[in-house]
Amino acid sequence: LLKILILTWIINIFAISALYSSETLKGMQIGSEDAPVSIIEYRSLTCSHCAEFSNETYPQLKSEFIDTGVVKFELRPFALNAIDLNAFKLLHCADEADFFALDKLLFNEQKKWIVTNPSDKVLENSTKALGDYGILFGISEDDYAECLNNEEITDFILSERINGVENFDISSTPTFIINGEIFSGNKSFEELEKIILKKS
């Protein structure tokens, strides 16, 4: 049922004739604007490889290259399914100061809020579980409900996916755009380090 839900959702996205756009929302960035290396990560919050990167590789990347001014890092949503869409909605409804902390928590506890049993209520139960994480960051039940119905945030998330496909031919997550060059799949710190040193 989950595979059918994902396939139907993706088909519906690409049935849209025009790109969505948002003037006020954007991917979240960290690092110096003057950094010689720019890394954009297209990721999915339900992707296990994205969680692995976030939990295992990103902390060292941040301490050795982002905090030292070598890398500017940007996160862009690439929703793979309806659960992903709701998770990204929650993330972008959080205060900007809480964005990276909530992002980290969702990846750390990914297996807890993706509720696969019973199989006929995956979306409903996972969406409810996400709301519990929102409360930890001051997002009330009413705020969360409003967030899920926020068209501007929905449009932004969908546009990022469509633009990622059209501009970079992205078909899987994570995908990294490093100074304009595309690298698909999860990357270890050692792999990224080699690329960064070549481009810096």
Task: Give the role of each language-model region.
Residues 79-172, 177-181, 186-190, 197-200:
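Cysteine-centric redox/oxidoreductase cores and disulfide-bonded domains
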Residues 1-85, 131, 135, 154-167, ...:
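Extracytoplasmic thiol/disulfide redox context detector
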